[in-house]
Structures are given as C-alpha cells and as structure tokens.
C-alpha cells in the first residue's frame, strides 16, 4: 500500500504533535465544555438500541456535527460500548486536500475537550 505522510508527528522542537480541537464550541460541531460534551455523548449512546450480542469486528460511524449525526453515531458506538479492543484503527477522509494515496499520521495525538 502506498502512503503519503503529512509530516505531523513532531514540530521543530521535536515535541510530539498534538492536534487541537478545530471545530469545538457553541458554533462548532460539538461542545467545547467537557461536562456538556460527555452528557451529549452518553445521551446518544444510551438512547440507541443494541443490535446484537456478538462483538463487532468493525464500525462505520458518521463524523458530522452532533446536531446532524449524533443519534446515528450513538447507535454505532452503542454496538461496541460493552466490549474492549486491543487495537483501534480510525480511517477518515481528507476534507481539505485531495489525496491520491493514503495519509498516515506517524506520531502524535488528538486533543479533545474531554
């Protein structure tokens, strides 16, 4: 598989790259206040029906603003909330650059309001 690295593993000071929340807040896609965000997430998951008893191998979930996709994302995550996983791989599209290959973040972390 060919990949394209976006070189976001570290900065000039050789400190790990931290991607800060880009769309949190009152006019964003999700709340910036931890207590409000946690309450929203719990309500979406708790309000969803459990589909089956077996452990899902994969999960497809929307990633739009919670006002648009919260109930659907809650249903998806409700299916895995009772299980633990050793490895989780998150795959998402690029919204800003058209990529011919896969982009992989070699190191770093995503910061959330939580």
Please identify what each model-predicted range represents.
Residues 7-114:
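Active-site histidine-anchored catalytic micro-motif
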């Amino acid at each position: 598989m060919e990949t394209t690295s976006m070189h976001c593993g570290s900065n000039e000071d050789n400190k790990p790259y931290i991607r800060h929340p880009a769309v949190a807040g009152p006019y964003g896609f999700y709340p910036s206040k931890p207590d409000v965000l946690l309450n929203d997430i719990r309500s979406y998951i708790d309000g969803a029906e459990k589909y089956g008893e077996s452990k899902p191998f994969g999960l497809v979930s929307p990633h739009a603003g919670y006002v648009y996709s919260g109930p659907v994302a809650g249903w998806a995550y409700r299916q895995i909330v009772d299980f633990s996983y050793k490895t989780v791989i998150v795959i998402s599209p690029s919204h800003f650059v058209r990529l011919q290959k896969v982009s992989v973040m070699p190191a770093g972390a995503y910061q959330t309001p939580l």
